[in-house]
């Protein structure tokens, strides 16, 4: 018989920097999960992602206090900021433009996010990512 799922915990944790301090410790502690075991496993799994990049993670906690977790691609907004070299998006995106992004850069971000996006092909994924860029005050070229 399969284990009974007790709860799901959704967090954004910096890659390779999971530790028992907030927000990880309190979120896992209230469900009785071994915090250090999660931190070690998460840090190993995120070795290939840039250190410090926020990574969404969904932790499934079972009734016997064991757990599994799935990491997702970093948020599109963070990837866009990284690839364009911009520090932060515009506070008034329809008036103040803070930078430009090309179709090639959009495709690069879309390919990283493809498994997490609700898109059937690359064009649809690029369209989704370009919407995110526009909402940050970044001009989409091409």
From Swiss-Prot:
It comes from the Bacteria. One or more lysine residues are methylated. SUPFAM superfamilies: Ribosomal L11/L12e N-terminal domain, Ribosomal protein L11, C-terminal domain. Keywords: Methylation, Ribonucleoprotein, Ribosomal protein, RNA-binding, rRNA-binding. InterPro entries: Ribosomal_uL11 (IPR000911), Ribosomal_uL11_bac-typ (IPR006519), Ribosomal_uL11_C (IPR020783), Ribosomal_uL11_C_sf (IPR036769), Ribosomal_uL11_N (IPR020784), Ribosomal_uL11_N_sf (IPR036796). The keyword Protein transport does not apply. It holds the Pfam family Ribosomal_L11_N. Transmembrane segments: none annotated. GO terms for biological process: translation. GO terms for cellular component: cytosolic large ribosomal subunit. GO terms for molecular function: large ribosomal subunit rRNA binding; structural constituent of ribosome. NCBIfam families: L11_bact. Part of the ribosomal stalk of the 50S ribosomal subunit. Interacts with L10 and the large rRNA to form the base of the stalk. L10 forms an elongated spine to which L12 dimers bind in a sequential fashion forming a multimeric L10(L12)X complex. Belongs to the universal ribosomal protein uL11 family. Forms part of the ribosomal stalk which helps the ribosome interact with GTP-bound translation factors. This is Large ribosomal subunit protein uL11. It comes from Ruthia magnifica subsp. Calyptogena magnifica. The gene is rplK.
